[in-house]
């Protein structure tokens, strides 16, 4: 086994020879086959109903210290009274290492910083899985990576079941009965309706992860039937695709009994006061997730403790989670990989290829504290051009002229032909990791079809010819093309490229694009912003081009499907409606919209597969995005943890922190360390500092 592992590592580090592309460079062709990748983990596929169920058990258990220090002292009701009528039960047969034991910590390292805890109003908690551990959603999709394709539907979560009307236009959702927020307040339909009516539908509020009314279908409505029942009404029949949008991160309700105290509709405050009413220093915010924030030290650490009212159990009735505490060390994203490999951190999504080689070397050592498992090539980067020609983002005259170019197919072809994707990939990491990616769907999704993926091979001279065709020539001899004399005084074409400065991969790709576009004759300048500012600029339409790491719709197709095209005024990443206006879609975009809407409405698997072939061909032929590179990610996890699913991708329906189902991850008793900062303590009252004994 050791020899095999070392040989596999050696083959990855050495790499493989490049393949030849036999085609006339100026002609579109099918994208080249990707190099084989021998280290990809194998997934064990299961049926959807083998993962969990809802039912009452004869008895329930909790950590002994909770019983002794809190229940017997009268500080908490008995565990059976804290659980819902029928808790969610994770089936032992789907747990790789079976039912676990209580104790220990999972130590995360992140590069983000928390704005506050108001997820519903758009505040980030710092990413890295903090929000995933705190906020639960109506449905759940991350574990679906292991579900057989013909059984693909979201898992129940806060919504334990749902029924369709005979005509398929109404969906009745049954919520878990008797579940409670972490402060003991009941969870019910009022929390769901507050999120929908006073956050998603309120145009002055922008929930984190971008939920809009269109996310759930144009004209969709939601109403409360009773305390534990809500009813959706859709314009189309049986739009099962919207069940995926009810998972992370677009339908994860917050605690209405707390949030209403700051919302303008109920408290007479401003929207800014609502958004910022629960800053990072506000501890013990009630959650439905497995862990509650109890400590925060700026630029140091966030600590979360187990939720005593968590509504999930194992088959023996042990209240989850098994892990008592989560740590989030506030550092950098690159340091996350370093600490996970070194053993001072416990988990990392190895998504920055610059760290691949060193991580492989260290993980190959028998004494390494962490194991490293690669998944499919689902980490991809596109360059998105701003397609709005009618004012999204209030562009000035220069930006308007650039957008006019962006809407020209020959210009887009010139740009994509000028991209040397092989060099971009090798600048990140050498070896069989990166692959040529022309844009469109990820090669890691089951809907990917190579023969439908059109590729314009690298051809700098052909690209320059296309620039001349659209009227761009270097008229002043400085190496950069100029606008025609009648536009902006014939000055140099200057394009601003938006990029996230928090990630080295994003920066490296952006810098590579600046150099490659300079050879084409386009002056590209970087607008490097931290993650929060970069996202704000994106949502506001303040960019010409932007580097964008692919989100779930490209990796899974069934998650966030409306975002594959401008199906609504605020669904596309690079083409949205201006305030009070409409999206001025181009002909190829209308084709994409029609295809995506048909896909959402269809329940025929063969038809859906064919529709995504059409989508891929239209998107890549028309250069809807400029694909840059694609590569696999690897899950780095400390060897002391059990119940890590084999082959778990770091990103498909969601990130690995959700994919591995952290609430059922455990550390065997003989492997547990002394890492808890607040042992035998539970969250205190909302707004009070720290946990309680």
UniProtKB/Swiss-Prot annotation:
Protein function: Involved in the transport of alpha-galactosides. Required for the utilization of raffinose and melibiose. Probably acts as a periplasmic substrate-binding protein for a transport system.
Family recorded in the similarity comment: Belongs to the bacterial solute-binding protein 5 family.
KO phenotype (gene knockout): Disruption mutant is unable to use melibiose and raffinose as carbon sources but it can use glucose and galactose.
Intrachain S-S bonds: none
Localisation: Periplasm
Pfam families registered for this protein in UniProt: SBP_bac_5
Name this polypeptide is given: Periplasmic alpha-galactoside-binding protein
Keywords tagged on the record: Periplasm, Plasmid, Signal, Sugar transport, Transport
Native organism: Rhizobium meliloti (strain 1021)
